Amino acid sequence: VKNAVIVPQGAKGGFILRKVPTERDALAAEGIACYKIFLRGLLDITDNIVNGKLVPPANVVRHDDDDPYLVVAADKGTATFSDTANAISAEYSFWLGDAFASGGSVGYDHKAMAITARGGWVAVERHFREMGKDIARDAFTAIGVGDMSGDVFGNGALLSKNMQLVAAFNHKHIFIDPMPDAAKTFAERARLFALPRSGWNDYNTALISKGGGVFERSAKSITLTSEMRTALGTDAKTATPDELIRIILKAPVELLWNGGIGTYVKAASETHEQVGDRANNGVRIDGAELRCAIVGEGGNLGFTQRGRIEYARKGGRINTDAIDNSGGVDCSDHEVNIKIALGAAVAAKRVTLKARDALLKKMTDEVADLVLVDNRLQTQAITIAQGQGVSLLEPASQLMTQLESEHFLNRAVEYLPDSKQLAELRSTKQGLTRPE
């Protein structure tokens, strides 16, 4: 679904390090060396374009049609490898040049543009607007997954000066501020965002309201003050760090902003084993247990799809990660398409590479605006569809049947209702949820 707003189809690829050095620099060097092997392997079997003509790879039996389009996207672990990938592209004289890997030194820096978080924030603002609240003007309470050094969480937590961040956690620390002062805490979050590799332990505790604090996730037990209990809506006097994270996730706040890594919400009908994220089994809750009004999914896979549906069925406002965080993928796609368009002019020596680079940089704000239009329109489309309620079930059913017959859709994989479940929805006068 995330690739619906862009040109290519997507696939996940990866590679495994056979030798894993313990020393940090050696590990990075080994990772890059293996990344190069992986990319050369891909380009060895990819069609190229030379002087406008398609050239298949040598000594390769091709079972598919001509297909020279291959781009690689930065992901967890390879986020800083774009220049390395583009050097391999140059080594192979690959037709895409430095459009092969977006976001390199001559490309759009997603974190500097805050594009993924800004796209997710478009969705958050829509949810609030549909509840009758303008968060550009009014204060709102929030909890978060992530920390200020992260692109999605950090940028997201700086998109409104009215955010009252009650609690947040990352893999090392838990931050709790029961009665936050929006102005003071915004300035402190901005300081942490600018501080390289900052964590919640770097937060100036003098700015935390009475009864709050920053706690280690390695602690045996944490005492919950009366202020913490009120803010988080719990009677527990003490809790282990894992128990406290579950309490935070269930807090009665307006927004849950997820900018972290891991799956924290499943459906009651799912087991932890089915989720496939063992590291977070101890902190995961069910969708029906959430008490926040809105979820913004800046990070990937924060919820299972069933968890989203369960939360939405009890009145929660949520889209999906693919909708909320499509900004990064969308921005990369714009970059690649602009580079392809200008590539022919550069090759024909009508434009110098330096002039192309200057033009790319000049277009940064315009590209961001175009990406955010997609975020606005796709969340609007979901709202319009949701507004049709029960009347949408029949056309949706026909569309699903058609897509299944053409092998574009597998309802079971996407957790979409079958004909029996659709009949139940009709009889109880319920439409599809936003995630569906």
Where is each model-derived feature located?
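Segments forming glycine/polar-rich beta-alpha architectures that bind adenosine-containing cofactors
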Residues: 1-9, 14
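Short, surface-exposed loop/turn segments at secondary-structure boundaries that line and modulate
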Residues: 14-15, 150
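Non-transmembrane, aqueous-exposed alpha-helical and coiled segments at domain scale
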Residues: 32, 36, 43-65, 78-436
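Conserved anion/nucleotide-ligand pocket segment
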Residues: 68-69, 73
